[in-house]
Amino acid sequence: MLATKLSRPLLNLPVKTLTVKNPGNSFRPVQRFCFPLLSSCGSRSYASEVDQIGSRAVLTLGLDLPWPKHLHTKGFIIYAGCLQKNKGEGGSKDLDNMNSDRMRTVQLNVCDSKEVDRAVEHVNSSLEDPEKGLWGLVNNAGISTFGEVEFTSMDTYMEVAEVNLWGTVRTTKAFLPLIRRSKGRVVNISSMMGRMGSPARSPYCITKFGVEAFSDCLRYEMQPQGVMVSIVEPGNFIAVTNLYSPERIKAIADKMWDELPEIVRKDYGRKYFDEQVSKMETYCNSGSTDTSPVIESVAHALTSTAPYTRYHPMDYYWWLRMQIMTHMPAAISDRLYVY
């Protein structure tokens, strides 16, 4: 694809983020290019931080990136929701070993309504002043998979949606009363794939598009309540998460092939199937390994007096592609990037 070949060198440029600008540095090339668009929001770049961070509590979900520790260094009281805390597994043990009274792990499965309700009760009862509520909620619990539509089972679609979309909705609804008390923040981790579709990623894209829509609606509703809602749309950071190891990709592919209807296997053939799996392996190995732009985006959304509605921590290649895919006619963007 011509656009991919021409813009591939952009992958070698530093990760782009619209999170924070350093007043001491000159504008980046893309910022200069987009200055007329961004100038109206320029005052937000130098917005101050909220005060009394040390007395504010934040609940974080998803431990694949180290933002509980980063937010802890900012001075927040952290409640880290952990899927397997009761088993002493996963990231909860590492956080507990910090032996900090500001780092508190909580058993929380976003797919279990009763467990979510128990987490709300636990957080509410352990807040220093429950009437002041919970300052922030960071929704990042998620899973992913791959496979073209005809290769993907309905069970897989529902499994991914239950965690990524309904888990976000369920947890947000449960903790909103505490967030409203503090006039605090909701930060939902979406993805660039919540803005543009991608072949072989429909289960994931569907859920992230849903998170985007949910977050927009929530932002409209919460604005009169004084609650600010931000969306973080990371680019390709999959190489530093635990979502896709080579072994996991192979296991998913083998299971998918074994469960395909005979007519689908016959029509597509194993050669085509293996080619798509190989593309996924390449994608998983090509992402950025510096997650600091994502972590800084979350921190800015929680600490700035004027947080952004959307943050775009991603390579310039993906940022440019996202702008083209979302703003140009599909007849053009599809030709450039898909066909």
Curated annotation (Swiss-Prot):
Regulation affecting activity: Requires phosphatidylcholine as an allosteric activator for enzymatic activity.
GO MF terms, alphabetically ordered: 3-hydroxybutyrate dehydrogenase activity
Catalytic reactions on record: (R)-3-hydroxybutanoate + NAD(+) = acetoacetate + NADH + H(+)
GO cellular component: a single term: mitochondrial matrix
Catalytic residues (positions): Y204 (proton acceptor)
DNA-binding is among the record's keywords: no
UniProt keywords, alphabetically: Allosteric enzyme, Lipid metabolism, Membrane, Mitochondrion, Mitochondrion inner membrane, NAD, Oxidoreductase, Transit peptide
Record keyword ATP-binding present: no
Location of the protein in the cell: Mitochondrion inner membrane; Mitochondrion matrix
CDD domains referenced in this protein's UniProt entry, alphabetically: type2_17beta_HSD-like_SDR_c (cd09805)
Enzyme Commission designation: 1.1.1.30
PROSITE patterns cross-referenced by the UniProt entry: ADH_SHORT
InterPro entries: NAD(P)-bd_dom_sf, Sc_DH/Rdtase_CS, SDR_fam
Interval spanned by the transit peptide: 1-46
Positions that bind substrate: S191
GO biological process: steroid metabolic process
UniProt family annotation: Belongs to the short-chain dehydrogenases/reductases (SDR) family.
Oligomer status and interactors: Homotetramer.
Name under which the protein is recorded: D-beta-hydroxybutyrate dehydrogenase, mitochondrial
Species whose genome carries this gene: Gallus gallus (Chicken)
Lineage of producing organism: Eukaryota, Metazoa, Chordata, Craniata, Vertebrata
